[in-house]
């Protein structure tokens, strides 16, 4: 049966001689149209298939499209009666496999292989696809560049480099110059002319006049933004004052405050509009104060409430603008911009050096990566040379049409490359996409390219260009399309998202489901009220999951009908029809565990935290102790693993043999005893030494495989739950080790640190979970992974969790396609503070809007995956003194003229903030239904319903142990014993186990871990901490890592600077009596390879010298043998000593740690601990007090350990605050 196309689809298929942009909404059949256009051009226009260039976003999409075209050609061939036409079709079928229907990377590779001589590269290159190898080459290139600058004889060049790194040295968010250079690389490689783009980074900081108001940055970016913001505020204020009858006594008392604020606001706006000097504008904005209190008045309560909102909005706007753009005077702004120009120029210079060195290393190895392919192809097609002319002419004459799928996801470089393939004056470009589904900003996709063409091609006078909109949705049921339109009508506008959704983006229901079928007719907002819910992070709690599991169980129990396109009939929904979409995969492991607990089958599409999986934690710990066995935490992790099976009591017994030495030393001492446990210790130590010897003469990959073989660890993990996946994970680590070695790296320690960096940078090496495990299971995936897919029933989960975009707009820099914003330390009034440049303030705002726009588009993708039923799940946190009705009232008021204002959208902190106003408004206006989960039934009327989940009444059902017992009445004796044990375990899991708290922590704790869990210490004990808080610090659930990263890498964070400072003070030689030897001590550590040159150059040597020259340290020179530094200790404590709400448990917890230093005076011990925490000089006394409270519990642990060791009593405890040069006593 012939397909019936809509008029717009027919135009897209049949139009010729024009550049076409097809804006195809979700589920609108764009792929079918693209395939049909190709077939028509072959059949009707007699184009050869190899005369078409079809660019897709993924290899899977390219393969699918090629297969569809091939199938259609085969169908036409079977029907064809004309011999010549049949021959033509056979030829096209023969050529389809070599036709360029591919990703843009594959096409670029074709360009390079065909015209490599145009840019003089070796044709015998290979493609570097392994992320590990790419990261290794980047590391090497960056290290070479850094060393080159540090050793450069050109002092000016060296100074520029050091100034760049110094600008980021004190960043508390660990954003370093290295981070900037690596981030710059990603942005630069997505630009058509990256050298020119980098060289323009300093442009916004360069002023040609004496007032920042005259700069291009102010006039083109900042001023329009401020005018818009204050215009909106003035409109609100004017409307409010017009509403008030100030002649009436009830309103009269409010008039002076409003009039004064309106007058001062008008003065500032006029000053802004007429470009008054910066300092004058600053003065007028500071005068915009809203004085007076708006007291509640029942007679005019609505006015007072609205007035309060306008007042708060005005105060907040004035505060934000003043502290952002006007925080410093014109003179200081000029100085900041001048320094910013120097840093930006240095960043561009060093970045270009890094790119050149990275390219040199790749060329030396005769390899290219993906970014090379696009850059080199662009270079081939754009150079002013005869060879480039030849390349352009070849492709421009070959391709009669250029088709680009998912055009909204292209970047500037890809778009520039595509434009070079067009012949001047020839309109043969066909682009299809949907800007509402542009969700790959992190890959440098630029939706602005689509929006610009959308606007241009939509104009009546756009000769040779045409815009076509696909609005019909053939995927989703009417309740789904109605809900999507309801939400996005208020969200996507020209000033937020680049498209007017109400006018041009709405979905038109066209799915054609049988109206007689009893299908689900409602989209659900599934919620529970929770005054204790947290929305501060992305972690899902059990309440969220119980709510979703309960709803899934009811869908299955009710046999909710869905339409099955394979049979053309309705059938009951199954688990396999359901998908759960989340913003990130952070909670995947927790979700899987909870679904398993309730017996609901779940297939996880991808699991984060590869390096945190049990098997990788054990093996990486083993590698660490092979490199250096004197590391307590990895050593204990290996001993407790299934390889050796040492119990907590075994470990405690070993530790007690000598509490003052490392665990490795205690283990060796204990092994000399004549006990069964000692024999096991000897076996372990023998194997460890054997592997250490083996590692000296063998490759890392060989070492790994030898561990697997000698320990049978592959077999052990294969026997565990999800064993095949665990085995694949271990195999993947072996393969990465081989790749690491093939790149020229051999050292085990460096490999351990490389893996640590991969984990830190979230470079996950995990293999995909085996697909055959999916079966009839609920599918869990991220929204990104769901793009292009569809499911009968979709749950969108985690709507109350905060976005984490703050990490992109805080710190020392903000980076965007439009430029680089910088923040750095600058001296103000004889004190140094971190200050934002104007460019940084502006880019924070611009980038925040881009990020929020992408989050809104991500929601659009999520909601449009649903075919027949959409369920939005949220755990709603109720503000203090507010019930749900009050919260709904607040949400509904945010909708103005059917839309959220830009100001409100810029305040959004979580997905629910985007959705709730429209949903609440719809509930008010349309009086939509409110139901409980238990009241839901199938086939109900309506398009949107709010479903309240009551945890007490609607709790998800756990597997029924009694039913299991009944079904096992005829079990054999052995089977009955197994069942009895399983039932006991089930009882324990439901709270029957008497020592449940003990299972949530370990019998072996590091002070550093306990310190992270402690809040402020209570007066008479260590801390008022809760056992539940320690779950996040449980070493068997979290990555094990004790090695400081700085030893063999150049990435420098505040924490690493602190650790390095400790290292210097540990090895400083007081015995020589030289108080000026800090420099020589640091030089010695660098020479021995214990400290990198880069980090050494960033240490605060003045602070270190201050301490060793202080009166506090004078005794260290006189009797250095009484000084103890980096002293290991261990002590046994009752759990209740550490955790306030720990249940009664007879066992103990072994706590270990390292004391920075103590000095044995005549009558007792002086204990001290170095701290490098930043201390605000303006609030130094308050900051020091907070530090004392913060570290009091830690020092008391050290005191207790020393007192129990039989040494002299601890007399005093001190914090050595290096950043502010203070030594303070702690009670």
Curated annotation (Swiss-Prot):
CDD domains tied to this protein: DEXQc_UvrD
Gene Ontology molecular-function annotations: 3'-5' DNA helicase activity; 3'-5' exonuclease activity; ATP binding; ATP hydrolysis activity; double-stranded DNA binding
Cofactor annotation: Mg(2+)
GO biological process: double-strand break repair via homologous recombination
EC number of the protein: 3.1.-.-, 5.6.2.4
Transmembrane feature ranges: none
Any Pfam family: UvrD-helicase
Reaction(s) catalysed (UniProt annotation): Couples ATP hydrolysis with the unwinding of duplex DNA by translocating in the 3'-5' direction; ATP + H2O = ADP + phosphate + H(+)
GO cellular component: cytosol; DNA helicase complex
Residue stretches making up the UvrD-like helicase C-terminal domain: 505-788
Binding positions for ATP per the UniProt entry: 24-31
Manganese recorded as keyword: no
Domain UvrD-like helicase ATP-binding: 3-477
HAMAP family reported for this sequence: AddA
Functional note: The heterodimer acts as both an ATP-dependent DNA helicase and an ATP-dependent, dual-direction single-stranded exonuclease. Recognizes the chi site generating a DNA molecule suitable for the initiation of homologous recombination. The AddA nuclease domain is required for chi fragment generation; this subunit has the helicase and 3' -> 5' nuclease activities.
Assembly description: Heterodimer of AddA and AddB/RexB.
UniProt record similarity statement: Belongs to the helicase family. AddA subfamily.
Name recorded for this polypeptide: ATP-dependent helicase/nuclease subunit A
Origin species: Lactobacillus delbrueckii subsp. bulgaricus (strain ATCC 11842 / DSM 20081 / BCRC 10696 / JCM 1002 / NBRC 13953 / NCIMB 11778 / NCTC 12712 / WDCM 00102 / Lb 14)
Upper lineage: Bacteria, Bacillati, Bacillota, Bacilli, Lactobacillales
């Amino acid at each position: 049966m012939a397909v019936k196309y809509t008029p717009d689809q027919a135009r897209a298929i049949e139009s010729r001689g024009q550049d076409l942009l097809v804006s195809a909404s979700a589920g609108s059949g764009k792929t079918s149209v693209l395939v049909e256009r190709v077939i028509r051009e072959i059949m009707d226009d007699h184009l050869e298939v190899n005369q078409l260039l079809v660019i897709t976003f993924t290899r899977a999409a390219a393969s699918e499209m090629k297969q569809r075209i091939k199938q259609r050609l085969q169908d036409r061939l079977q029907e064809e009666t004309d011999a010549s036409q049949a021959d033509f079709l056979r030829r096209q079928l023969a050529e389809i496999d070599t036709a360029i229907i591919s990703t843009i990377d594959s096409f670029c590779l074709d360009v390079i292989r065909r015209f490599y001589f145009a840019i003089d590269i070796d044709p015998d290159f290979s493609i570097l696809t392994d992320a590990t190898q790419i990261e290794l080459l980047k590391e090497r290139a960056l290290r070479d560049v850094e060393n080159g600058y540090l050793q450069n004889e050109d002092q000016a060049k060296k100074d520029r480099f050091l100034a760049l790194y110094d600008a980021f040295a004190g960043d508390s968010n660990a954003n370093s110059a290295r981070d900037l250079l690596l981030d710059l690389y990603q942005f630069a490689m997505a630009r058509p002319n990256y050298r020119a783009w980098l060289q323009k980074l300093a442009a916004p900081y360069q002023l040609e006049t004496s007032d920042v108001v005259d700069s291009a940055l102010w006039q083109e970016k900042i001023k329009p933004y401020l005018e818009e913001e204050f215009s909106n505020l003035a409109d609100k204020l004017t409307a409010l004052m017009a509403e008030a009858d100030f002649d009436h006594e009830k309103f009269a008392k409010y008039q002076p405050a409003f009039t004064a604020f309106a007058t001062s606001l008008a003065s500032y706006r006029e000053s802004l509009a007429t470009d008054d000097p910066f300092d004058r504008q600053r003065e007028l904005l500071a005068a915009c104060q809203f004085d007076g209190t708006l007291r509640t008045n029942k007679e005019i309560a609505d006015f007072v409430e609205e007035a309060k909102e306008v007042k708060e909005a005005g105060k907040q706007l004035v505060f934000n603008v003043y502290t952002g753009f006007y925080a410093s005077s014109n003179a200081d702004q000029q100085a900041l911009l001048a320094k910013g120009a120097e840093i930006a120029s240095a960043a561009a210079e060093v970045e270009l050096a890094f790119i050149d060195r990275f390219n040199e290393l790749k060329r030396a190895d005769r390899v290219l990566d993906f970014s090379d392919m696009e850059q080199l192809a662009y270079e081939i097609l754009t150079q002013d040379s005869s060879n480039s002319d030849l390349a352009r002419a070849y492709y421009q004459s070959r391709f009669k049409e250029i088709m680009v799928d998912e055009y909204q996801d292209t970047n500037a470089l890809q778009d520039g490359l595509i434009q070079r393939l067009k012949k001047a004056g020839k309109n043969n470009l066909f682009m299809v996409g949907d800007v509402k589904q542009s969700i790959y900003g992190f890959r440098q996709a630029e939706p602005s390219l689509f929006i610009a063409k959308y606007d241009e091609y939509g104009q009546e006078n756009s000769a040779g260009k045409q815009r076509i909109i696909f609005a019909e949705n053939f995927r989703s049921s009417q309740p789904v399309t109605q809900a999507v339109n309801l939400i996005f009508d208020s969200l996507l506008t020209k000033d937020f998202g680049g498209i007017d959704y109400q006018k041009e983006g709405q979905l038109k229901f066209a799915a054609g489901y049988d109206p007689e079928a009893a299908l689900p007719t409602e989209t659900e907002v599934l919620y529970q009220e929770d005054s204790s819910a947290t929305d501060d992070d992305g972690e899902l709690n059990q309440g969220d999951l119980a709510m979703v599991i309960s709803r899934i169980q009811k869908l299955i129990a009710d046999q909710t009908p869905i339409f099955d396109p394979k049979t053309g009939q309705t059938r009951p929904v199954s688990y396999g029809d359901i998908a759960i979409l989340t913003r990130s995969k952070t909670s995947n492991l927790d979700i899987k565990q909870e679904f398993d607990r309730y017996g609901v089958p779940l297939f996880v599409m991808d699991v984060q935290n590869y390096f945190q999986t049990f098997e990788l934690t054990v093996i990486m710990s083993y590698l660490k102790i092979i490199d250096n066995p004197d590391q307590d935490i990895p050593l204990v992790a290996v001993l407790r693993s299934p390889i050796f099976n040492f119990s907590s009591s075994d470990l405690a017994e070993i530790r007690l043999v000598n509490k003052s030495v490392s665990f490795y030393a205690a283990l060796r001492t204990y092994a000399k005893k004549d006990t069964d446990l000692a024999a096991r210790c000897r076996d372990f130590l023998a194997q460890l030494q054997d592997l250490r010897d083996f590692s000296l003469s063998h490759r890392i990959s060989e070492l790994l495989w030898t561990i697997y073989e000698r320990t049978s660890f592959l077999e052990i993990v294969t026997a565990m739950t999800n064993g095949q996946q665990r085995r694949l994970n271990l195999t993947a680590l072996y393969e990465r080790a081989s790749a690491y070695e093939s790149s020229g790296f051999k050292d085990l320690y460096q490999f351990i640190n490389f893996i640590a960096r991969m984990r830190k940078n979230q470079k996950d090496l995990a293999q995909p979970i085996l697909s055959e495990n999916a079966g009839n299971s609920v599918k869990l995936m991220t929204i990104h992974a769901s793009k292009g897919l569809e499911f009968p029933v979709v749950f969108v989960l985690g709507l109350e969790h905060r976005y984490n975009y703050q990490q992109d707009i805080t710190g020392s820099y903000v980076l965007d396609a439009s430029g680089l914003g910088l923040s750095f330390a600058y001296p103000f009034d004889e004190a140094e503070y971190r200050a934002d440049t104007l460019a940084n303030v502006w880019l924070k705002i611009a980038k925040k809007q881009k990020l929020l726009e992408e989050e809104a588009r991500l929601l659009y993708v999520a909601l449009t995956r649903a075919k027949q039923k959409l369920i939005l799940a949220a755990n709603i946190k109720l503000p203090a003194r507010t019930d749900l009705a009050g919260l709904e009232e607040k949400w509904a008021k945010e909708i103005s003229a059917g839309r959220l204002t830009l100001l409100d959208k810029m305040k959004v902190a979580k997905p629910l903030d985007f959705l709730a106003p429209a949903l609440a408004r719809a509930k008010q206006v349309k009086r939509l239904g409110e139901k409980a989960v238990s009241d839901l039934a199938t086939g109900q009327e309506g398009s949107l319903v709010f479903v309240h989940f009551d945890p007490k009444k609607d709790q998800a059902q756990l597997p029924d142990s009694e039913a299991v017992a009944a079904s096992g009445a005829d079990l054999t004796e052995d089977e009955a014993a197994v069942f009895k044990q399983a039932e006991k375990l089930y009882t324990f899991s439901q709270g029957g186990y008497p020592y449940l708290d003990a299972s949530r922590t370990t019998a072996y704790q590091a002070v550093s871990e306990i310190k992270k869990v402690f809040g402020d210490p209570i007066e008479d004990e260590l801390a008022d901490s809760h056992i539940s808080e320690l779950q996040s610090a449980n070493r068997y659930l979290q990555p094990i890592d004790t090695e400081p990263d700085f030893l063999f890498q150049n990435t420098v964070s505040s924490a690493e600077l602190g650790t390095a400072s400790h290292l210097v003070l540990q090895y400083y030689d007081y015995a020589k009596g030289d108080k000026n030897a800090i420099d020589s001590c640091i030089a010695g550590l660098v020479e021995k390879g214990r400290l990198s040159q880069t980090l050494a150059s960033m240490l605060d040597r003045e602070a270190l010298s201050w301490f060793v020259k202080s009166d506090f340290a004078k005794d260290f020179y006189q009797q250095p043998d009484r000084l103890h530094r980096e002293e290991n200790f261990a002590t046994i404590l009752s759990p209740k000593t550490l955790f306030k709400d720990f249940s009664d448990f007879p066992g103990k917890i072994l706590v270990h740690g390292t004391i920075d230093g103590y000095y044995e005076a005549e009558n007792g011990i002086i204990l001290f601990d170095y701290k490098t925490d930043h201390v605000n000089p303006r609030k130094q006394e308050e900051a020091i007090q907070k530090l004392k409270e913060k570290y009091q519990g830690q020092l008391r642990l050290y005191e207790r350990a020393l007192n129990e060791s039989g040494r002299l009593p601890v007399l005093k405890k001190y914090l050595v605050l290096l950043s502010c040069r203070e030594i303070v006593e702690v009670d």
